[in-house]
């Protein structure tokens, strides 16, 4: 009996530790927070300071643009916000730029905005993802709930630009997962192509990688407990967030970009997403030396060359 009681006590202790640990990771990952992610986990303090200085430059550039605040209602009743920046000359081409986890349009796309607007002559739509910026929402959607929001913004842009609109999607990190999941749904014919930069194959695989790589923890039972909390509070399951599964259903043109020095979403996920993609019109590009979400700043010339060719052939 004494041994049995000790076993029960040990089991209770393990269960309690699992619940506490799972709650810690849930609070770390799922609820809304205001702090931005600074890309490049291995960056020095000097590099991070330089990135913050660049952000100040992006904000000055944005302040000089004739940007308009747009609002839309999500499928579940949230008020969504986006900035719309028209091209200098009238055009029916628009790029919808979908930012990543705990980030913002300026943080992820600030350096690209002049390229898209001034060189590619495109209108720009910069949505704040649900749970970020001026959009409502108390939880991170990891691409699942968010992809419905992207479809809402697609409809808003077609309504604004008319039936001749050419709509492109470009997502970074979690935003890349979002646009891949979006591509698996039936979309209006005005959607011409999708660019995904450092997107994960599935949320389960990404969280499994992070728990092993950064925390050196077994995936279970933690992941199952966090998943239950997420379903209860945020309304989705981790298995819903599956870009690779969505790619098996798409016929849209795809440009897939990844850095070969990405230690957050490892570059092997580029190959898995590419292989999963059912589109006959797809291309993958590996940027040498690029950390997570830093492919553009690492090799701007190659990035712009690939994007220019992709859009130019399909707009």
Name each model feature, range by range:
Residues 243, 252, 266-275:
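Short alpha-helix in the alpha/beta-hydrolase fold that links the catalytic acid
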